[in-house]
Each structure stands twice: as C-alpha cells, then as structure tokens.
C-alpha cells in the first residue's frame, strides 16, 4: 500500500460503511435571495465545482471491490464495475496500464485498485481511473501463473505424451543462459565430473528483466540454426524470487520451448521453484547441476557398463564356442566320419542291388504286358469280319455300299460287289430266288 488514502467497498463490519472525509474546500456562492433566480448557479458550474472538489479530494485512492461487467473494446482500454454488497463504481483502465497488468482481469475477481476519482461532467457521473491493480488473497504474479497454466494445460502443452526422450549419449549440448550467472558455472562444474568428450555450446542470453524473453527465444533460434544441430537444448538460470524467474513463465517462451525440434531440458532456479518452462520442457531438471546429471552420461558408469558388456560378450562367446565344439565332436563320432570309404562301398553295393532289382522288375512287367496284349489281339481277331471271310464267308453290297441281307434288297440288273477274303467280285443280278415261304418272286 502507498501513503495515499484507502478505503474498502466491502462492509467494514460496523453498522455504517467506512467513510473517507475529503478536505474542506471553500466553494464560491452568490448571496442568496429567497425569491430571485439570480441566486441559482448553472449545472455546468455546479458540476465543475463538484469535479474540482472530488478530483482534488481523492488523489491516488485504493479501492477494494469485485470486478463485474468487464468490457474489452478494440482500443485496448478496459471498462468495468467495482462493487461491494451495497455500492458500486465504474472503473476504467487505460491501454497503457492494461498492457502492463501481469494477470488477466476477469469478472468475479476480488481486487485492490489504486487510481484517481474522475468526474465525467457531460453525464454528471464519476469513475475510478485505475493506475494499479492487484488481486486480493493471491499475488498478481501467482494469479497470472495460475491463469496461463490453466490455459496451456487445456491446449495439451503439458501432456506426458508430448515428452521426448533424451539421447543416451549426446554429441553436442547447447545451453541458453547468462554467461556470467551461477547456472553455467554449476553446469560446467558438474559436466567436467561426468563426461569430457561431449561438446557443450554456451549461447549467451539475458535471463531476467526487460528483453529477457526475447533474448532467450533468440538463443533457442540460434541453437536450431547450428550445424550440426545440438542433440539437447537446455534453458537455464539460477534461483531467485518469483519476479526474478518470471521470464520463464512468459507465454511466448513457453510456446517456443513447446515448438522446439530439439529435445529440451528446463533447469530453472532451485528445487522448490516450478516455472511453466519446467512443465512444458521434455525434461525438468531441479537445478543446473541436476541438468548435467540428466543430460550427460557419467564417465565412470559408462566405463563400468562397458566392462560389464565386454564380460558378458566374452562369456556368451565362450559358451557358443563350447557348444559348437560339442556339436563337431558329435558329428566326428558318426560312422560316416570314422570309415568313410567303407560307407561309400556299402552305398555302392546298395545302388547296384537296387539297379538289378529295377531291371528285373521292368522285364517282368514288360513280359506281362506283352502276354496280355497277345490275348487281347487274339480275341479281337476272332471277332474281326476278316476272320469270318477267311472261313469262306463273303459280304455283298450294292453300289451304294448297302449290305445285301435279303433277296428283296436287290432287283434284276443291279450291280453288286461281293467281298471275299482275297478280293472283291463284281456281278450283275439277272434274277433272284427266294426260299419257300417268302413273298418275293423273280
């Protein structure tokens, strides 16, 4: 609070609300007359005198109340109402003040506002022109932190699924911090005790005060332009108050860390300090020293791990050689390796035996097939018309090739062909005779 007059719009607990007595001011008045209009003053004059009295009587007054009906026109000014249980007053915060407000003013907030009471003569009303504002019950920075944290949390910027793993053995590490601060000294001291073969690049940046946010973001951009690009990007500073660390709660810096293509580590302040940069980074280190232990592999641990790996490889190799040697000995004990020529002779005799058996089987199958074929041929020959002709029979056909089966099939003068076993006989029918009982006649 300042030395300025202050009062609360909330009930003070007494039957009467708290009052502020303005300094007495002599007001010019004309000598009154009971019936003349010459005694009256104009509304403008009355308003002017009220404005002069009020504005000079309440300079830099602190007012406690609840924000309602807040309006945010495109001009950037803020218009709202401050109220308590019994009264209310209109308030205005010009753009130049609103832009410097660390938290977002909203309906329902209980605040302390310091400003000047101003009379608006055109309407005969008054308002509080706010020059300072802070939340009640929670500091302005704490409120701003909570508001921005809720906003970014709703966007998913702090979700564990976004977090990336750090490389096990980075080749190049970039750290954006003050070149003269304790953070870089602590980090380098811890790094020297862990692994000396990793390149560490310091990107100088302002970490506190005006322009620090832009400086930190420029440092991150510089890291992304490096070739080869760093495997890990650390944003760091030493401890301090909430105000000292406030740059690491800035929305622009937090979004820049979230958008980084390089895995990020936030190492800000001491163990008890938590910034929004800590929440959005892939890895949060409690201190710059802790950042070194998380990013850089421990040299002694790596040597021990390599020794253990070498021992394990040697053991596995020995077991494999022993196993393969046993397999080779088992193969060597088989007969094929004991007397290979005898095995070849035995297999050769088996091949000759199978060859003889195959040939005999083939000849037997061939003889059986020939005998079966002769039987079938004899049966076919017995049924053949040629065999019938050979026994003295013949077949007579007309010129049209029709077989003559009856005397009625021919007429005198027909030409006939008679097939015998050794050739054909051509004849002409002179007459035909039918057996008794047939109706055909010559």
UniProtKB/Swiss-Prot annotation:
Similarity section: Belongs to the XseA family.
Keywords linked to the UniProt accession: Cytoplasm, Exonuclease, Hydrolase, Nuclease
Coiled-coil positions: none
Any one Pfam family match given in the protein's UniProt record, by short name: tRNA_anti_2
Subcellular location: Cytoplasm
Biased composition (Basic residues): 22-33
GO biological process terms on file: DNA catabolic process
Annotated signal peptide: none
Gene that specifies this protein: xseA
Region ranges (Disordered): 1-38
Protein name: Exodeoxyribonuclease 7 large subunit
